[in-house]
Amino acid sequence: MNKNSISLKFKHLYEMFKPTILSVAIFFSCGEKPQNTTFDITKHIECSLEDCIEEYAIYPLKSDIPINQIEFGMAFDSLSFYKSSNSKEIYYFVNNEYISKLASIGRGPGEYMNINNYTYNPYNNTIVISSENEKFHIYSLPDMNLVRTVNRDGFVKGMYPLSDSTILTVNHCDEKFQNGYGIYIVNVNNGHRTLIEEIPYINSFWFSGNEFTQTDSSILIPVSGCPNRIIEYKNNKISDLATITFNNNNIPKEIYAKEISTIDEKMNFTNFFLENDYKIGCFYPIITNSLTTLWHTPKINNQYQFMMLAYNNSSYINFSFHIPGINRRIIPDYVADGYYVLIIQEPIDYLIDTSESLSKLGKEIIDTMKKQNNNNPILLYFKIKPSILNEK
């Protein structure tokens, strides 16, 4: 794998709020009539990650200074960016070498603001940040100097660059429905936004960071809501590639609804899922001609299971992965160039599972971590085998 070929991709994993799907109906559009298949989440297998990937690579993030706990990663060619877990900093790397850091946004101590999310804009080499005070902050690279601050409307849950002055966003929309969301094109020079797709209901915990995924010719937007959708933005148009809806198994009839149409339905639906600790959605879809994969965390027997659903027109399996000898749940932190990416930053003593022997991959991970200055993070890139369903 050539790291320099990595296209602009975005992370979207939040550790606490992940989807639960007891069984779902999913409709994939493949140029012909969409197919309707019911997926049973209990149909899953556990296996070693090494048995299910066709290639992988490990990259240490190189820095002479300590890197705080990071999340919300993204990559563009040789450039990569990470937000600190405390939502205060953004780190900038080239070829995995530390270049600079945005230490804070705001006027000074006591007035620093949290970074809700951000995107790199390759068209003008800037970072666009959405802060907690309903503003866009644009910073130049590599010096991280403030270029301008622009007022914005609504809470922004995700951003993706379209040109030097416009970005694609998912953000709060009150035009037609209370507390709804929409997909917008926003001008970051003046904050003006144009609604291109309404989303009447989405999970309030969805899109804590960027989940957009870029293909060769389009942008994929996974929407966790009712229904869940994988939306494609291509040639200035929006279309659904997949629609994922719940079956009503284990969900009371008065709660279950394929389409949320009223505020009362929305509140009942939301309250039920919160009170029963259910989560909904789909994350990190990668769609090819032969295979679709996406991730979810169903709650089975009162325990969260971290799973990847692999699907084609004839079969499907839910996979739970592990790396022998490594104490680390396997669910990606972002997608880059068709690869899933894990940010590994746990202490080595915690990572090593003494109950089993280290696999070849596990040994490479530990050896790389031991060489890191300041216990800084490393990245594990991996690509799922296209034939994974045929081998299980």
Regions found by a protein language model. Give the residues of each.
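Repeated scaffold domains used in trafficking and secretory/extracellular systems
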Residues: 68-72, 113-118, 154-161, 204-211, ...
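Short loop/turn segments that connect beta-strands within beta-propeller blades
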Residues: 93-97, 140-144, 187-191, 233-236, ...
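Beta-strand-rich domains and repeat architectures in extracellular enzymes and scaffolds
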Residues: 57-88
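Surface-exposed loop and turn segments in beta-propeller and other repeat-based domains
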Residues: 56-65, 100-111, 194-207, 241-271, ...
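A short helix->beta-strand "capping" segment at the edge of beta-propeller domains
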Residues: 41-67
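Short beta-strand elements that form the blades of beta-propeller/WD-repeat-like
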Residues: 77-85, 125-131, 165-176, 216-224, ...
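Blade-loop segments of beta-propeller domains
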Residues: 98-124, 131
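Asp-box/WD-like beta-propeller blade repeats and closely related beta-sheet repeat scaffolds
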Residues: 134-163, 169-175, 195-201
